[in-house]
């Protein structure tokens, strides 16, 4: 082997070793106790190198280290790069930390980036009920009705967990409440699936009431019969049967229609400018 080839191979090996140490330092797995992120980068660690499935920027978001996220971006980390799971750093940040989300968005992160299952960061923020991340993403142009591989929206993801705070924010931004996924489920039916497992709390009940106000009318029965899992809970089955049997009133259907006609914007601001009495504005905003 020529000396020049040996030097190249040694250089690559050294850089790889530094980059691996960078990942471990960010994750606080310190093989070298005195390592720090800035020194490793200065020494030649590649801020865009992938180790296994991990990239440094994604790892910093996983541990909610906003200062490290900003440092990596300043040193050239690719803000929209995909890791081994086809996820961007923003997907991880959206689950955990608003500060990381804000830094990534400031550096040009795509709020509508898709992972391998076509999930957006907003799907994950809604699922984890990270309400401030939900709001930050929506304010930065995230699509409130983005569809994943199953045609589920962020509202569906929030509803299946009974995440009242995230559901409320998504509805404020005009999320479509009557969306149907590929197997016939709606946001409110996803929430019912949680309630029938006996996992509902007062917050989940409030979430159901909010979705019910938003949708106006919903139907869970097939050929006049409630799903078997609902029928196992007589009290819940009776309540849902009454709600499904009652036709939507003109008032509730008009609310849904007006909200939808306002389009994809922050509805509290849009409704504020309408020439309506305060009581009707509150009604449109699902406050009663």
Curated annotation (Swiss-Prot):
SMART domains: ANK, SOCS_box
ANK repeat extents: 52-81, 85-113, 117-146, 150-179
Phosphoserine modification, residue list: 17
InterPro entries assigned: Ankyrin_rpt, Ankyrin_rpt-contain_sf, ASB8_SOCS, SOCS_box, SOCS_box-like_dom_sf
Cellular component GO terms held in the UniProt record: cytoplasm
PROSITE patterns named in the record: ANK_REP_REGION (PS50297), ANK_REPEAT (PS50088), SOCS (PS50225)
Main location: cytoplasm
CDD domains: SOCS_ASB8 (cd03727)
Modifications made to the protein after synthesis: Phosphorylated by TBK1.
The SOCS box domain, residue ranges: 235-288
Pathway, per record: Protein modification; protein ubiquitination
One Pfam family from the record: Ank_2
One biological process term in Gene Ontology: intracellular signal transduction
Keywords: ANK repeat, Cytoplasm, Phosphoprotein, Repeat, Ubl conjugation pathway
Subcellular location: Cytoplasm
Domain commentary: The SOCS box domain mediates the interaction with the Elongin BC complex, an adapter module in different E3 ubiquitin-protein ligase complexes.
Summary of subunit composition and partner proteins: Interacts with TBK1; this interaction promotes TBK1 proteasomal degradation.
Function comment: May be a substrate-recognition component of a SCF-like ECS (Elongin-Cullin-SOCS-box protein) E3 ubiquitin-protein ligase complex which mediates the ubiquitination and subsequent proteasomal degradation of target proteins. Inhibits IFN-beta production through the IRF3 signaling pathway by targeting TBK1 via 'Lys-48'-linked ubiquitination, leading to its proteasomal degradation.
Similarity section: Belongs to the ankyrin SOCS box (ASB) family.
Listed name of the protein: Ankyrin repeat and SOCS box protein 8
Species of origin: Pongo abelii
